[in-house]
Amino acid sequence: MTADLCDCNVEIFENNSLYNKNVYELDGILQCFDNENSLNLVYRYILKYKSLPDDTRLKLQIKLDTVVDRLIDEAKNALNSGYKIISLADPLSGTKFLGERGARIYIQKIFTDFLVRLKNPCEKYGGHIHICPRLSFLIYNYCELCIEFKKVRLSKAYDSLLEAILFESVDTVTACKCIHFLGKVDEITVLRWERDDNT
């Protein structure tokens, strides 16, 4: 992924009312395990994923399903309460913590399924998912799904990424720039699922 696709420059909103009213910050999957003091165990499972015994892999899957189900329910409740954007950041999933092999396994075996599941209620409620630059970078490099990162020109320039997402008709999933970005925004990066068939 090129540096111009993911822009990490950020200024923090001085007036947070628009942000607080519309953006729900959903914990990342690994952050949830950290909150439960089981992150180190999950890290070890991810790093040894391919060589895990079947029963251990099943235990990991049950743990993951429990956390993902809880996060999906939390996102649904937020959307039902009037939030417009589910903001996803999972700093504990970076290569700094997992290494390249672990990050690849995390994106391919865990995160992409979660993202697909989260996309459904967002579409139902007319909401959006925004993915932070770091997580966007991992998806771009390691995702096996047919996902296209596409820059979309907006109908006008906005003063922040948040305003662009809220006031412009863009795809459900946006990525790359930080949700807190302030400055001229006249295009936005969206994630589009390419069709696998020829129809």
Which residues are covered by each model-predicted region?
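Active-site loop segments of alpha/beta catalytic cores
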Residues: 1-199
